[in-house]
Amino acid sequence: MQSATVDETRRRTVQGVALSFLGYVVYALSDASVRELHGALPPFEVVFFGSLLGLLAVPFVRGKGDRWADLLRCHDRRMWTIRGAAAAVGAVCSVVAFTQLPMAEAFALLFLLPGFVTILSVIFLKEPVGWRRWSAVVVGFIGVLIVLRPGFHVLKLGHFAALTGGFAGAVTVVLLRHLGNSEKPISLYGAGLLGPLAVGLALSLPHFVVPNTVHDAIFIVSYGLMGAAGNILMMVSGRMAPASIVAPTQYSQMLWGIALGYGLFGDRLDWVMILGAIIIIGAGLFTFAREKVKQPHATTLRPPVHPQ
């Protein structure tokens, strides 16, 4: 009987990890849709439409007894609002980054997120961090310098947007760790969805651009639907497999980003950028591994790299 239970747990874990990989494929397709828009629509407007279509995922996210109103209900309104604001900043910055940068370069900078999480966890959660994780943070920043090559590489708004997006994502992760035991998952999801929706709508209205081609309409819808589908896959994955096991699969998103950037947009990769990306990924994976060692029974929240 115990053996059957263990086998069932393993089967669900494998299925959960597989769904997670699929989720990051879908997220990468959502990001590629932004790139395909080529800046035809303002970033705030893209975020608004993406969040609006993201509402389609809510029925799949709702737990037993959850209501639509629970998207707005919370115990700590101030932290809930900050969570929504961080999600909005991350969404807008990721759209700017994927519009202006090669996909692999944008992902490399966004994936500095685990380093930011370590720093914020020490400051706000008073989490003890040893020299190994601090070393990973330093190595991650070295990887960023290699990717950016200041003085040898023309820096764009997209580079700063990607770094800001990674920082905003780290704020979200730290807030989820802080609020995870006191708020319903649907409430936390609501903040991450309604924040970008409200900010995107408010800031896009003064210069609203109606998609005037079928191409633009298709890819703005693709951005939102793929984001919603990715959210659903990740929620189901999280219910089937421990988050600490699923978390490292997020780095597969960079591989898909490289493939899509090269195959669809003709992005060119040089060895310096690849080296920097490998260093950043290695630092992030090491951080996850150390968190699992220090807190083997804790839930490691997956960084929400995707804007939704």
Give the predicted meaning of each segment.
Residues Q2, L255-Q308:
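C-terminal-most transmembrane helix of multi-pass membrane proteins
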Residues R132-L148, G169, V272-E291:
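Hydrophobic transmembrane alpha-helices of multi-pass small-molecule transport proteins
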